[in-house]
């Protein structure tokens, strides 16, 4: 009898341990599921898009610029507004496009009719090595310039100027997909010139833009009054 009692007690203890382990395992699954839902709701592409959409709807271009910026690449609010204005001019609903990407493929790119890459969603780091984070990304313009002017120089910003080689293609580097005002200086046969010029992303194709600055000779035709051409 004592042996039977001890066996029964052992079986009861074993069952209690199993129940405890299963309960602990179930609780752990619930915790992990909750954490998974929490982090997916705070790191998913919809969260990133929502922040940008909110800034766009409030016309907070400074915040838009902050979202578009990275540690090595900073946008200004003027550039951010220019990019949004360009997409509007091309009848691109950036809010709809990004939301569609976030809900379907999670990553993707918004393009225009000329195959310019404008804005997109891409994978970033993984939180705790598990939960995928996403970020808004932009794509630069690769700009070149050609000119027939002598001693040409193009001032692309307050701190940057580039000497343009005559009758050659000069690389100006990569810039944000946004309009910008620039200053062109050079020489022609009749003397020095200095003119304000504009970088217009609408002229770009496949994220490449070539700026042409040429002086042209034109024949000027003048008609004089009859009394001037036939003096008496």
Predicted regions and their residues:
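Structural motif
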Residues: 142-153, 223-230
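Short, solvent-exposed S/T- and G/P-enriched segments that are highly enriched in secreted/extracellular
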Residues: 157-176, 232
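Gram-positive cell-envelope targeting signals
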Residues: 1-84
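Short solvent-exposed beta->alpha transition segments
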Residues: 40-41, 65-118
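Structured interaction patches on ligand/partner-binding surfaces of diverse proteins
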Residues: 108-125, 187-216
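Conserved "repeat-terminator" motif of extracellular CCP/Sushi domains
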Residues: 134-138, 207-226
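Extended amphipathic alpha-helical interaction segments
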Residues: 141-146, 154, 160-163, 184
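A short, solvent-exposed beta-strand micro-motif common in secreted/extracellular proteins
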Residues: 170-171, 175-195
């Amino acid at each position: 009898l004592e042996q039977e009692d001890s066996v029964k007690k052992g079986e009861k203890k074993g069952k209690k341990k199993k129940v405890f382990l299963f309960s602990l395992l179930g609780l752990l699954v619930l915790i992990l599921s909750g954490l998974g839902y929490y982090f997916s709701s705070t790191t998913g592409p919809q969260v990133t898009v929502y922040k940008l959409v909110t800034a766009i709807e409030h016309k907070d271009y400074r915040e838009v610029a902050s979202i578009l910026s990275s540690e090595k690449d900073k946008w200004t609010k003027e550039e951010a507004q220019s990019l949004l204005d360009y997409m509007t001019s091309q009848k691109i609903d950036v809010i709809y496009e990004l939301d569609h990407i976030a809900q379907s493929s999670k990553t993707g790119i918004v393009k225009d009719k000329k195959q310019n890459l404008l804005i997109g969603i891409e994978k970033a780091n993984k939180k705790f090595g598990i939960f995928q984070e996403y970020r808004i990304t932009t794509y630069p313009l690769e700009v070149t310039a050609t000119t027939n002017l002598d001693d040409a120089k193009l001032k692309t910003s307050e701190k940057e100027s580039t000497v343009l080689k005559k009758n050659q293609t000069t690389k100006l580097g990569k810039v944000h997909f946004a309009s910008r005002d620039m200053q062109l200086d050079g020489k022609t046969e009749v003397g020095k010139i200095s003119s304000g010029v504009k970088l217009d992303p609408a002229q770009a194709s496949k994220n490449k833009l070539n700026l042409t600055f040429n002086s042209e000779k034109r024949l000027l035709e003048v008609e004089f009054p009859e009394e001037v051409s036939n003096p008496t």
